[in-house]
Amino acid sequence: MTRQELFKKVRSARYTHLDPETASYYAEREGNTLRLLFEESNGKTDWKNNFRFLAIPTKPYKGMTATWFAHRGFFGVWKIIEPHLVDLVADPTVERIEIAGYSHGGAIALLCFEYCTYHRPDIEVTGIGFGAPRVFWGPVPRAVKERMAGFQVIRNGGDIVTHLPPRLFGFRQIGQLEVVGEPVGPIEDHFPSAYKHALTE
């Protein structure tokens, strides 16, 4: 599936809503591949979570020695979704996991990628965040940083969302950053139509 096709899929998928306006996901199997998608902000509660960017210390798994810090709002949404994906991710017939999200969903996709690479180091895991905001804060442990190296953030032009929360507040981009498209405006560059156009070039 091309990135253009994946972006279209992210925007058109029929999401399972676990909490109105808060947590949603889409999961499908295609052969041995598990595809997990996360949608953009879909209500006032999502927007409130987007601005709950106080960082919290995170040690999400039993026996995990490394502590890292994450955006409080995004991490809270991910923890609602996580229990619904545990069995899907652990399924031994899954040989590849493909993760993607747009905007708010890009941040959740990043946290899902971290979860999947930690729990399924035996398989290929890919992750893309289209117009994804920053999630990690402060120093990131080497083991976590190495796992996250395969996550790709796609930034269209000067998309302002990919610069938030600001570095001034200690947040940092993690993974690989790729810029597509020509800058038009910091807000306009975040529009779905702008990403759709940039990904066709």
Per-segment meaning from a language model:
Residues 1-100, 104-201:
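Non-catalytic, mobile gating and regulatory segments of ester bond hydrolases
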